[in-house]
Structures are given as structure tokens and as C-alpha cells.
Amino acid sequence: MKTVTIITIIVVIIVVILIIMVLSKSCVSHFRNVGSLNSRDVNLKDDFSYANIDDPYNKPFVLNNLINPTKCQEIMQFANGKLFDSQVLSGTDKNIRNSQQMWISKNNPMVKPIFENICRQFNVPFDNAEDLQVVRYLPNQYYNEHHDSCCDSSKQCSEFIERGGQRILTVLIYLNNEFSDGHTYFPNLNQKFKPKTGDALVFYPLANNSNKCHPYSLHAGMPVTSGEKWIANLWFRERKFS
């Protein structure tokens, strides 16, 4: 009788352990999924193309209250008067993107704590971050569908990659809400986002453990119909950004 009881207990323990293992794999959070971002360039082929749509991918999500409204105002005031026409990889093309932008050094005391916060939460090195890009959209301005990283073997892409590899993490902060429309739209997911002031939209340009752009990461800044839309982009590369 004692032997049967001991066997039953052992079986129950094994079943419980197996259940815990299954749940731990299926319930991995967004933050744990990016825990290895700082080493995801290991053993990857330099095949900068497109992943299949059914390849593994962590979908976009909103990170609430990343910065407070006072900090948002401070960034907008600092950027105002320093803006120039936004650019894409191939230069300035207003048929693709017709906003205004400027850059703030990631070492600027005004924004450095934001970067450090993201680095802690997502386990990415500070050195892998680009500078902060601040963007303003006026009425009827937009950014057509695009990927945040490189998806072909063009000269522009090669030069882009040389500066630290692919972009592997995008943190897009909405600095204000005083505008109409202007959502961030992911056509292949049929999802659009318009976070509140100080919230960040987080997404990954690449398929999991890959150098390839995932179709789900294709996105657009929809046209603003009234007011001014202000955002700030934090991008992190595979390696140290230069």
C-alpha cells in the first residue's frame, strides 16, 4: 500500500512539473521574448530579405506611461525650430514621407534616462541605440508603408547595415494627442494604434532570430487630418551603433 502511495505521489509530481514547463513556454512575456536581443546577430546569415508571413514574430503592443506629459512637452519644445524635411533611406522623397524631423543625442541628459529605461526593460545595450528621432506631422502629412530595417541587398542597405546591423527594436513614443487620425497602421495585421500622450508603441522589424524583415512589421503613419502629431522614435541595432 505504501509503495502504491509513493508511486502515485511521484506520478503527480512529474505531471505537475510537465504542466509548469508547458505553461512557462506558452506564457512568455514580451519582455522575456526580447531578453536575447543583444545577441541575436549570432550565427545569422547576411540574407537581408523578407521572412515568410508565417515565420515566428512578436506582434506590436503598447507600453503605457513610458514618459510623463511634462517630458513630452520638453522634447517638443526642444525640437521646435530645429526641424528639417524628413528623409528615407534613399533620401528625401515626399511621395513616401512628408513630415519634419530632427535628432537628439541619446547622451543628452533630457532623453538619456528614457534610453536607459528601455535598455533595462528589454535587455538591450545602450551602445546599440541610435539617437532619438523627433518627428512632426502637419495636416495631410503621412509616412507611407515601410519597414524600419533593410530588406534588400542595395548599396543603401549595405551602408545602413555597416553602422550596427539591422534595427531589431522600435519604440515609438506619442508625444501628444492634439490631432485627428494619424494612427500607426500595420496593414498585414489589420491593426492600427493611436497611443495616448507618453505611451509607446513597441514592435520588432525582424522575424524572430532572423535578419529578415517580417511582413507583419510593415507599417505606415496615416495622414493627419487636423492638428499636429508629434512622435519620438527609439531604434536599437544588432550591434553597437556608429
From Swiss-Prot:
It is an enzyme of class 1 (oxidoreductase). Its main location: virion. Residues 128-238 form the Fe2OG dioxygenase domain. Its cofactor is Fe cation; L-ascorbate. GO terms for cellular component: virion component. GO terms for molecular function: iron ion binding; L-ascorbic acid binding; procollagen-proline 4-dioxygenase activity. It catalyses: L-prolyl-[collagen] + 2-oxoglutarate + O2 = trans-4-hydroxy-L-prolyl-[collagen] + succinate + CO2. Keywords: Dioxygenase, Iron, Metal-binding, Oxidoreductase, Virion, Vitamin C. Its EC number is 1.14.11.2. InterPro entries: Oxoglu/Fe-dep_dioxygenase_dom, P4HA-like, Pro_4_hyd_alph, Pro_4_hyd_alph_FE2OG_OXY. It is found in: Virion. Gene3D superfamilies: q2cbj1_9rhob like domain. Belongs to the P4HA family. May catalyze the post-translational formation of 4-hydroxyproline in -Xaa-Pro-Gly- sequences in the 6 collagen-like proteins of Mimivirus. This is Putative prolyl 4-hydroxylase. It comes from Acanthamoeba polyphaga mimivirus.
